[in-house]
Structure formats: structure tokens, C-alpha cells
Amino acid sequence: MGCIKSKEDKGPAIKYRNTPEPVSVSHYGAEPTQATPWPSSSGWGTAFNFSSLSMTGFGGSSGVTPFGGASSSFSVVPSPYPAGLTGGVTIFVALYDYEARTTEDLSFKGGERFQIINNTEGDWWEARSIATGKNGYIPSNYVAPADSIAAEEWYFGKMGRKDAERLLLNPGNQRGIFLVRESETTKGAYSLSIRDWDEIRGDNVKHYKIRKLDNGGYYITTRAQFDTLQKLVKHSTEHADGLCHKLTTVCPTVKPQTQGLAKDAWEIPRESLRLEVKLGQGCFGEVWMGTWNGTTKVAIKTLKLGTMMPEAFLQEAQIMKKLRHDKLVPLYAVVSEEPIYIVTEFMSKGSLLDFLKEGDGKYLKLPQLVDMAAQIADGMAYIERMNYIHRDLRAANILVGENLVCKIADFGLARLIEDNEYTARQGAKFPIKWTAPEAALYGRFTIKSDVWSFGILQTELTTKGRVPYPGMVNREVLEQVERGYRMPCPQGCPESLHELMNLCWKKDPDERPTFEYIQSFLEDYFTAAEPQYQPGENL
């Protein structure tokens, strides 16, 4: 967790599932039960959760500031499962192997079948293994109803076009590898996504709409209709029949992160955590790689005494844990007595800032950097929909995983910091260079001030981690920005991308784009804005 040091004081961030559209409730209202969203997914788990996704910390060389913030409203997703799944009458099948983490969990193998005894707990269901007869808790995102489409290995549920392309284009995948997902545009329809190759585009992904007939059948072209989706897929593995290539193998996936560490593992005892490898430190604490309960690798943020009030932290953490999106680092558990510990998903690649400056990010070209920006915009568009605010969006607070997957960290806590050097907003610990002028000068933090910060983050990406406003101290940045100064286009950066940055830096917050627009712009960047892009020396 770290801080920004100004010059004045000499001191130096595989499967996919989106969260369904929420139902709004009061930001500080009673905490509702929230189940893992389904059946908008395959039951394969939450999205793009590579098991080795990285976690960095607060500071170290990257100067990470600790956290984000909140606005006045928040939304949650109600349980999509009917109450009728109680009584042990519904059969579910395991999609992955799972090793028990506590004495109340069940270990199981993929393909094992269960009777669901009680699903009212949301993320962890009480179940009975049909094979062993044992009862225990299982993670609900590791199972799907037996004999359903969701139980098929090729079904990836509610996944966007861009995320399907990211998965299929991963290194090592071959032509003909495929997946099936929900259609983004047509309710009740599906999309078949196939990796292809041609001389003009090289490796690419083709998408085909699978439509449903009134009588329940499925088709891509009307001349070939099938009773079930399974029969359509099987036929397409044997005959291209108008597709770019016949289907070869299912796109590989890695089992997802569970929602939380275990049943009722939210406020946990300090003794259940073992701190093993220190990953970084900053003004407000440290971050460690560690183990929970002797079984589960996690990241642990330890806060210095007095950083924030435990009661305020716990209240905010209850809200933060409800924010679930594949581009946000999930909050697993807390130690709520000082010194406060925050337990999150462990991510191995480090912060985006360190990755760009010292890791493999140094060698990335513009397409990869724009895709990373699009992923961050995807996560921020979710925060935007949920009426939340980050407050500290920058490369130091973005975490990088395998295959360049990005997740947003440290959202929801910046407004809780008690340190005078931070709360003054112009103190040495405050990230002035990333903060919109109305927020830095008057404390007006909104999602539009996050948009400003995203524009600054784009300069970090295109300059491989250079500090914004090079050669300028914090006070000078504030004065110059108020007078209308904006950073020039980084060397090698296309002007069309710099134009997006300038939109993010509009003086009037209402004139700045939404994250939904930014995500769309970046995802289609090389087809709409820069179709003639050619790699340069740096970008």
C-alpha cells in the first residue's frame, strides 16, 4: 500500500463471467444475501480468474497508494437460484476439482455429482456427495445443474466478445479451438467463437450467432437445424458446414477463484493467517503473500495502527466484498481489530506500474497496452454502473496476471484514511498528479474524477510507467492544470489515443466520457480508430 512522494519532501495494479445487472439498494442499508450470479454463467465460475493472477502491494518501488473510495449508493445482485433448491432433490455436477480448506468443506473431483441440501447461504452450499455419501459445503460457482448446458465444458456462460477473443488468442491455442457463450445482443441466443487464421489478419477470432427456433431447436444457418445445442456443437466438430473451420478442441480454462475463502470466513482470527513473503510496503502498511488456515494462498495487506477507524473500515469492507467483477481484485476476508488485515486474491505478476517499468511490460506494443486499458475500463464501467467511486485509480493500483489480465485493486478505502498528510489532499502522501482538479482542490470525488485519473493512467501505459507531468512538482501541476495545461501526446502514441486522454481531462466533469464509452472505444480501437496501425520502436 503506498503513497506518492513529492519532490518537495525528497521522496521518490480462465473463464469469464460478468455480473448481471444489479438491483439498487442504499449504500449503507442492511446487507442483503448475495449469491454467486448464475445462470448468466456456465457455472464455471467468475471470469478470467486465472489461478495465478497477481497481487501487489501497497508501495515498494512503485509508490502504490493504498485505496479507493465510495459514493452514496450501491447495488447488489440477488440470488438467481430459486428457493426450491433445498431438500436435497436437485442434482448438480462438479465442474472442477476442489480441495477442502476447512473441516466443514467437501473435497471433490470434477464430474462428481451432488444433492444440494441447502443453497440459501449464497456462495457456499450444503451438499451431499452421491459418490461418497458425505455432507459438507461446496463453492457454488464450482458446480452446475447436471445435464444442463451449463455443465458442458465448452459453455462459458455470460462472456463478452472481447473476453472471448482474449481467451482464444492466448499463446498455445490453435486454429479451430472454440467456446460457446451467451449472446450479448439477442436474449435466448448464443454465440460460437472460433479461433481462425488467414494471411491478411493472421490469428483472429470469428463469432457466429446461434439462434433458437420457436420449437426449441438451434441453428447457425437455417439449412442445418438441431434439436439441442449439444448436437449442433457435435456436428460442427465433424463438419465446418459454412464455419471458418470445424471445431477442434474446447478453449482451455483454469478453475476460478471461489467467492470468499470458505463458509462464514469473513471476519477471521489473525492466527489463521501466516505471513510468508513481503511483497511491498508504503506509507500506510505492508503487503504480504501468505496462507490462510494452512491451505489457501492469499495476499494480506497489513495496515499501520491509526490508518483508519476499524468501525468505518468494516462498514466499507462489507460493501466492497459485494463488488464482484472479473476485472476487480476480490476481497476475501478481514481482521477487523487493529492492526487491520485485508485478505484478497493473491496475484503473482505485481502491479501494472512495476510490470511496465521492471517486468515484461517493458516490451509490450500498443495493441497489448490498449487491451490492458480496455480491461481496466471494463472494470471501471462496472464500478460506474454500481454507483461506486475508486478515488485512487492509477497503474500502481492495477494488478497484472497471466496472459496480461488486469484487475483493479484498492477500491473503496481512500476516503477512510485518517493520516493528515493524506487527508489534506495536497500533502506529500496524496496522489496529486493523478487527481482531477475539482477533487484535489475541493474534495469533489465522483466517477468523473475517476475518468480524469484514467486519462493519466493511459499516459503511464504508453510511456511504460513514467511519472506523469515529468519535471513538475505537485504544486506546479495543480497551478498549471488549473490554467488549462494538459500533458502532450507521449512519444509514439497515436493522436487518436491522445484525443481520448484529453476527453478524460475536460475541465467540466460532465463533459468527460463515461467508462462505458471508453471501454467500447478501446475494445474497437484497431478496427475503428487506428486500422492502419504498424508497430513502432517503442509502441
Curated annotation (Swiss-Prot):
Keyword list, A-Z: ATP-binding, Cell junction, Cell membrane, Cytoplasm, Cytoskeleton, Kinase, Lipoprotein, Membrane, Myristate, Nucleotide-binding, Palmitate, Phosphoprotein, Proto-oncogene, SH2 domain, SH3 domain, Transferase, Tyrosine-protein kinase
Domain SH3: 87-148
Highest taxon of the lineage: Eukaryota
Catalytic activity: L-tyrosyl-[protein] + ATP = O-phospho-L-tyrosyl-[protein] + ADP + H(+)
Active site annotation, chain numbering: D392 (proton acceptor)
GO molecular function, one term: ATP binding
Subcellular location: Cell membrane; Cytoplasm, Cytoskeleton, Microtubule organizing center, Centrosome; Cytoplasm, Cytosol; Cell junction
Family matches, as Gene3D superfamilies: Phosphorylase Kinase, domain 1, SH2 domain, SH3 Domains, Transferase(Phosphotransferase) domain 1
Transferase is among the record's keywords: yes
Residues anchoring lipid (N-myristoyl glycine): G2
Span of domain Protein kinase: 273-526
GO terms, biological process: cell differentiation; cell surface receptor protein tyrosine kinase signaling pathway
Sites of S-palmitoyl cysteine lipidation: C3
Description of post-translational modifications: Phosphorylated. Phosphorylation by CSK on the C-terminal tail maintains the enzyme in an inactive state. Autophosphorylation at Tyr-422 maintains enzyme activity by blocking CSK-mediated inhibition. Palmitoylation at Cys-3 promotes membrane localization.
Record-listed ATP binding positions: L279, G280, Q281, G282, C283, F284, G285, E286, V287, K301
Oligomeric form and interacting partners: Interacts with YAP1. Interacts with FASLG. Interacts with CTNND1; this interaction allows YES1-mediated activation of FYN and FER and subsequent phosphorylation of CTNND1. Interacts with CSF1R. Interacts with IL6ST/gp130. Interacts with SCRIB, when YES1 is in a closed conformation; the interaction facilitates YES1 autophosphorylation.
Recorded family membership: Belongs to the protein kinase superfamily. Tyr protein kinase family. SRC subfamily.
Record-given protein name: Tyrosine-protein kinase Yes
Source species: Canis lupus familiaris (Dog)
Gene behind this protein: YES1
